Curated annotation (Swiss-Prot):
This is A-kinase anchor protein 10, mitochondrial. GO terms for biological process: protein localization; signal transduction. GO terms for cellular component: cytosol; mitochondrion; plasma membrane; protein-containing complex. Residues 1-55, 261-282, 524-548 are annotated as: Disordered. It comes from Homo sapiens.
Length: 662
């Protein structure tokens, strides 16, 4: 799917010809390998250091323009790799104030406690869902059930078009500069021709993968260019000026195609001679292909989602549609990369307001949460920034007598977040009073809930709170780091193997089962409500059978998963009290004034078990004595006598109370 991002298993060599949306992922992948140095030219081109923006820009330009000197590229890359490695080692060096002796009983601080850890994988925003390849398929499935999947797909394709278009425009600009430099009267170089042909082949391969290679046809296929251009223009309802611009650009493309095909033949035409003698010709053809791919992608997106005769058009106005047409067919003949940005914002708002809240409550999101919780890589941030998971974690911390650590972290983090949100525009005295509440509770020598911080941390907090102008938003950073590290290293592993964690999983699984049963019934009955009740469809039985089999298979998978984690439902589910094996059958009855349950309907005679003959019953009574029923009956008689005696005494004392009141 376009827009979902490149696959994590793609190698850097396959991503190298494309300088567009894969570059950000490529930089992340190369970050862990910045220490390695190879002699391969392609590997050195791909190894872009994330610590040096100048190096990243330069290598990006080299990838697009393909400079002639590979030796210079090797030298520059090696030097900047060594510089980045030394700078990274300096940054990773632990400062003097972060030594182990600085921290108290809560353990050593976590140096990775940064802003990126304030996000939980279990609670997502719509923007995070659209950029996360794990939860995005669940959201698409949810939208497919609502027949609104075209909104998600349009947003993804428009986002991909926006990023790739800017990268292609940058490549076009670099090739234009390179073409102007090569246009000077210099003797042709074989090295230039090899480099340009390599870039042309690489671009052709990338455009074939993205579905845009249909514009770059051979001479035999170039006959249908005018027909396809006319159909595209009619479908887009473009103006006459736009038609002329399209035809002009396509004629240029056909001329470039003729030029490429004729270069392979042994002819003496003027076009062939000019192509062989000018090293700028392949770069000019490359730039033309880049701009053609932008135009074709814009046309495809418009045809699928914005055109009036699209299968599932997005909800936009006619004025917005005309604006998009004007941006695609600009006066200068270029496509605006931001032509779909406004439509993206409309679609994003529609998904957020009408569908996303329901998705968070659906079993699709529960399935995603189960996948995260069972992946084996659950972090503390996933628990602390998710309300449902934080509830179970707080119960676990309370059982471990460490809930004060969690409460301090929540209170201090909330305090710092509120101060940071005000951006310095807050009352210093009020902030100091709030900070003193936390200090008196957790840090002072007379603290009500001491956490074990040492004197160094306590003095640091005192100086941060009592500063002139009030405390800063980072006044509790050091104890927050210690509390975070303690919960992460000491309590999180125990929580992930506790019964409360399995109860959390069990609740999610039960919610998925219930929603699947309800959703399955609705999906099976909804198609039948469209037509008359007596109308039968030949394929309805097959579809219902397939849907029921799929539902049973999914439930079986969840059942096996439930058994695999070994959840003791008797100790976790309160409803199990009503499912005891030794509990008697439920019967109708009433409770008397004395608290005795009196049955209103006795079981049928044949249901009662045979107690044997009269002789056997007499022998049992003689051997065992009175039965339980007889003893219970005698106890009720005694209770009635006691209650009646008390009632008589109360009625006897009642006239005296009335006389005293009078």
């Amino acid at each position: 799917m376009r827009g979902a991002g490149p696959s994590p298993r793609q190698s850097p060599r396959t991503l190298r010809p494309d300088p567009g949306p894969a570059m950000s992922f490529f930089r992340r992948k190369v970050k862990g390998k910045e220490q390695e140095k190879t002699s391969d030219v392609k590997s050195i081109k791909a190894s872009i250091s994330v610590h040096s923006p100048q190096k990243s820009t330069k290598n990006h330009a080299l990838l697009e323009a393909a400079g002639p000197s590979h030796v210079a590229i090797n030298a520059i890359s090696a030097n900047m790799d060594s510089f980045s490695s030394s700078r990274t080692a300096t940054l990773k060096k632990q400062p003097s104030h972060m030594e182990a002796a600085h921290f108290g009983d809560l353990g050593r601080s976590c140096l990775d406690y940064q802003t990126q850890e304030t996000k939980s994988s279990l609670s997502k925003t719509l923007e995070q869902v659209l950029h996360d390849t794990i939860v995005l398929p669940y959201f698409i499935q949810f939208m497919e059930l609502r027949r609104m999947e075209h909104l998600v797909k349009f947003w993804l394709e428009a986002e991909s078009f926006h990023s790739t278009t800017w990268s292609r425009i940058r490549a076009h600009s670099l090739n234009t500069v390179k073409q102007s430099s090569l246009a000077e009267p210099v003797s042709p170089s074989k090295k230039h021709e090899t480099t340009a042909s390599f870039l042309t082949d690489s671009l052709d391969k990338r455009l074939e993968d993205s579905g845009s290679a249909q514009l770059f046809m051979t001479h035999s296929e170039g006959i249908d260019l005018n027909n396809r251009t006319n159909s595209t223009q009619n479908h887009l309802l473009l103006s006459q000026e736009c038609d002329s611009a399209h035809s002009l650009r396509l004629e240029m493309a056909r001329a470039g195609t003729h030029q490429v095909s004729m270069e392979t033949q042994e002819s003496s035409s003027t076009l062939t001679v000019a192509s062989r003698n000018s090293p700028a010709s392949p770069l000019k053809e490359l730039s033309g292909k880049l701009m053609k791919s932008i135009e074709q992608d814009a046309v495809n997106t418009f045809t699928k989602y914005i055109s009036p005769d699209a299968a599932k058009p997005i909800p936009i106005t006619e004025a917005m549609r005309n604006d998009i047409i004007a941006r695609i067919c600009g006066e200068d003949g270029q496509v605006d990369p931001n032509c779909f940005v406004l439509a993206q914002s409309i679609v994003f708002s529609a998904m957020e307001q009408e569908h996303f809240s329901e998705f968070l409550r659906s079993h699709h999101f529960c399935k995603y949460q189960i996948e995260v919780l069972t992946s084996g890589t659950v972090y503390l941030a996933d628990i602390l920034f998710c309300e449902s998971a934080l509830f179970y974690f707080s119960e676990y911390m309370e059982k471990e007598d460490a809930v004060n650590i969690l409460q301090f972290w929540l209170a201090a983090d909330n305090f710092q977040s509120q101060l940071a949100a005000k951006k310095g525009q807050y009352d210093g005295q009020e902030a100091q009073n709030d900070a003193m509440i936390l200090y008196d509770k957790y840090f002072s020598l007379q603290a009500t809930h001491p956490l074990g911080f040492d004197d160094v941390v306590r003095l640091e907090i005192e100086s941060n709170i009592c500063r002139e102008g009030g405390p800063l938003p980072n006044c509790f950073t050091t104890p927050l780091r210690q509390a975070w590290t303690t919960m992460e290293k000491v309590f999180l592993p125990g929580f992930l193997s506790s019964n409360l964690y399995y109860k959390y999983l069990n609740d999610l699984i039960h919610s998925v089962r219930g929603d699947e049963f309800l959703g399955g019934n609705v999906s099976l009955t909804a198609p039948g409500s469209v037509g008359p009740p007596d109308e039968s469809h030949p394929g309805s039985s097959d579809s219902s059978a397939s849907q029921s089999s799929v539902k049973k298979a999914s439930i079986k998978i969840l059942k096996n998963f439930d058994e695999a984690i070994i959840v003791d439902a008797a100790s976790l589910d309160p409803e199990s009290l009503y499912q005891r094996t030794y509990a008697g059958k439920m019967t109708f009855g009433r409770v008397s004034d004395l608290g005795q349950f009196i049955r209103e309907s006795e079981p049928e005679p044949d249901v009662r078990k045979s107690k044997g003959s009269m002789f056997s019953q007499a022998m049992k009574k003689w051997v065992q004595g009175n039965t339980d029923e007889a003893q219970e009956e005698l106890a009720w008689k005694i209770a009635k006598m006691i209650v009646s005696d008390i009632m008589q005494q109360a009625q006897y004392d009642q006239p005296l109370e009335k006389s005293t009141k009078l």
